[in-house]
Amino acid sequence: MKLQWWQGPCQPLDHVARTKAESRQQQLTKPAGSLGRLEKLAIHLAALQGRERPSLDKLWIAIFAGDHGVVAEGVSAYPQAVTGQMLANFVSGGAAISVLARELDAALEVIDLGTAEPLPPLPGVRHLYVGAGTQNLAREPAMTLSQLLICLEAGRDSLLRARAVGCDLFVGGEMGIGNTTAAAALACWLLGCPASELAGPGTGLDGAGVAHKARVIDAALALHHAQIDGPLQALVHLGGFEIAALTGAYLAAAQQGIAVLVDGFICSVAALLAVRLNPGCRDWLLFAHHGAEPGHVRVLQALGAEPLLELGLRLGEGSGAALAVPLLRLACSLHGQMATFAEAAVAQRPQ
């Protein structure tokens, strides 16, 4: 059987660079281990970048957007029109991720994979019309296999554009009213959990709304169970265009040797799908935060992930990942710019 592109090998970590970075950490003017996880982050980034002193100068943020047919089941507190409206807000500079991208001097790419309401061409938005959003996963498969493949490739293509300009850290974000329902459904399938354990408020549902959302997800899982035989079919039946694109981007990043900072619940579900499709990509994924959606912690546990922040976030857009970028940059700066004991003429601890 012919291998698909996402099954190709991921780049190996550079163990020589890791060893050099570990040695450097032992020589810096501080007690060994006193910077905690910042030391481990710098060492891991050294292994990813293949250099003793890593840096994160070029940040690429890609926002993938798409609508969800399951909104017809009353699973969101916001109307579906918001997806398209937010695309305009992203490129006009008014969204949270727009502000964060400016502050971080990051490239921001916005990709429209298909909104329910047709949009005029928006300057600064890449319009890739895969469909008028997904179908209602509570009633039928969310998308066709052809649509899934297009979305996976859309994620890969964004990553390749990032690589072409020398990106050294990729952040994926998402926008799509109803996408926490799709993400929770996928997480339930991936983890074998009932929806009552993973469904959350999304954009702001109350307790009754969350309970209804869980019932919709459980019904969808029962409807599609017999047809799902792996991650790709899970995406076809339960996924979203933007979730598939994120999955493709994460896989391509590992194949191209670019570190990824994963955002919240939806992005973490895409990361788990990517790891299930190609386990070698796991080393290239860093996890920004533990968000407020109840399913997020379960997905992070399945990935063996240690998130950097816990701020009660549930916005999406890549915002939590963007907030964690300064922490990674400071870890690199401390590692690369602190003096060694020899350089500073500081006495070391006696052996």
From Swiss-Prot:
Family, as annotated: Belongs to the CobT family.
This enzyme's EC code(s): 2.4.2.21
Function of the molecule: Catalyzes the synthesis of alpha-ribazole-5'-phosphate from nicotinate mononucleotide (NAMN) and 5,6-dimethylbenzimidazole (DMB).
Ranges in coiled-coil conformation: none
UniProt protein name: Nicotinate-nucleotide--dimethylbenzimidazole phosphoribosyltransferase
Highest taxon in the source lineage: Bacteria
Chain's gene name: cobT
Keyword entries, A-Z: Cobalamin biosynthesis, Glycosyltransferase, Transferase
Organism this protein belongs to: Ectopseudomonas mendocina (strain ymp) (Pseudomonas mendocina)
